[in-house]
Amino acid sequence: MKLNILRLLVVTLACASAFVVITKVRAEKTASSITPTLPQPAQQPAVTAAQQDKPTEQVQKNIKVLTGLPQWQLIPVMNYMAASMGRRCNYCHVNNNGQWDYASDDKQEKNTAREMIKLVLDTNKNTFKGNVEVGCYTCHRGRSQPQSIPALPLPVPSPGGGQRPGGGGPPAQGPGQQPQAQPSPSASPAQPTADDILNKYINAIGGTAAIDKIKTRVMKGSMATANGQTISYEIHQTAPNKAYELFTTQRGSMERAVNGETGWEKNPQGVHELVGQPLADLKLSLQLFRNIKLKEQFTRLRFGGRDKVGDREAYVLNAGTADNRRERLYFDAENGLLLRRVTFTQTIVGVIPEQIDFEDYREVEGVKLPFAIRVSSVDPGNPISTRKFDEIKLNAPIDDSKFNMPPKAATP
């Protein structure tokens, strides 16, 4: 017991400068992300698609403690560390007049970070049997230095709402007093099953017959980022496994598509075929029925209690997939609509969440669909982005050539 406590105390220092070396990389999102990878500054050329599944030490320079981390997880892990400490890249990395030297070890903060990451890895390995129970956020909670002393004054407990100082249980009885009757707990309402919740959702959005009529979907609108930038966005989807999306920004445009088992991306740096984890991510996120036919996506579903999403009471489902991805789904307890979807990506230094909120449901040809989708992530540069659609069309014709990969530019 003392050993466990000691290790947990040690971890309060963990990730104090938790950034490691990155050299010129482009952000790739987590496995369930629907947030776009936007064109990156010229200073950060893209890592090739073939490199994304390689260990990061085979792609980047001077990686010392995150050996074995897949390259595609590197940017999400960096974002997780930054969010955990409320810091940005320059806390650990060298920037000379706007030029990043990610491989440099000149800053002591980065060297300290390596030691702290080792402590996190060791604690999870030796205390929690290899499970990732402790991460940077465990202690930092958005601060560069963990707070180890309680802040005074402490919150005042509500009358009758807490235990007596020094222990729990009912109040002590005086001499000759009879024990006071304790109120019996109120009966808990019957818990719905996972099937109850999912069936109610299907009926709420229009029913199986209406859903099965959907063959294509075209959505057009805009995406607002956390820094106030507005990006034009559109997506074209054909069942069962084709999709194309276009982002238009002030810096240019970006296209991404899935055509069955293949995928590609076109940005200002050129056309790239997607393979490995980035392709799997895109195939998952662009599925036409991704947020409609939920039951088929999971091998494990169980009721997770009640919660609130905004001012709405919600039922929660804890879900798991065949490849051990975990998600949490929130459904409006009254009308049955899907309100929120939280996905979790496990890495060697912590579990990275992403939250997707669905709002402004409207009926389109007999099916209710959200016209606003808000994505919250641990990306410090864009923690919240909101997509709002001006139009959604079902079963509109889509030219199949839209999903084909464009020819690559000739090499000079």
Where are these regions (language model features)?
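Sec-dependent N-terminal signal peptides
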Residues: 1-28
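Acidic/charged, solvent-exposed loop-and-adjacent secondary-structure segments enriched in E/D, K/R, S/T
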Residues: 264-290
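Gly/Pro-enriched, hydrophobic low-complexity segments
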Residues: 250-252, 310-409
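Sequence context surrounding c-type heme c attachment/ligation sites in exported
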Residues: 32-197
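Edge/loop elements at the starts and ends of beta-strands within beta-rich repeat scaffolds
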Residues: 190, 210-215, 228, 349-351, ...
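Short, conserved active-site entrance elements at the starts or edges of catalytic domains
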Residues: 281-318, 337-340
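N-terminal mature ectodomain segment of secretory-pathway/periplasmic proteins
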Residues: 196-271, 296-308, 321
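An anionic, turn-rich surface loop/hairpin at beta-sheet edges
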Residues: 103-113, 277-285, 346-357
